[in-house]
Amino acid sequence: IYVGNHYCLWDVFFPAHTTKDGIHYLAKDSILHAPVIGGWAKGVGVIGAMRDGTDVHTVMDAMRVLKNGEKISMFPEGTRNKTGSDEFLPFHGGSALLAIKTKTPVIPFVICTPPRFLRRTHVVFGEPMELSEYYDRKLTPADYEAAEEKLKARLYELRANFRAEQAAKKKREK
């Protein structure tokens, strides 16, 4: 499961460039019905999710994909972050739930600079992480929230490490 922050529609292409295998995407259900992009979304295997979080079929479809050994990319913020802030939007919990229920590793990635036309976008991928401390036990909503916070902390860490490396590089160049 690829899990990252979300700035724009083009963010979906970053995880796709890291794998030769196909990749599915978890996205809002309305994408599948959009006039132009809907056909493309269906063709690349988008799994539509209802925004209210009550769609059991979405979870079941995603679990089936993962259990078949296929990959999913998702943005746990649930929508594009248009705030201009460095803070991530609140995570909605689905990524940790899927990783735990299917015992699938999470590949965290962070988009360090918002994509801009004709500008370099920096995307950092972390090492796969397991949420194995949550496997094979009865979990509470607080447990899922803690797992999701662990993922969010890893994204912040990846971005902080990238920025520290960039600052050190600039300092050496002076």
What are these regions (language model features)?
Residues I1-G53, D61:
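Catalytic core of membrane glycerolipid acyltransferases/transacylases, capturing the structured
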Residues V56:
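Catalytic centers of nucleases
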Residues V59-K174:
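Non-catalytic C-terminal accessory region of glycerolipid acyltransferases
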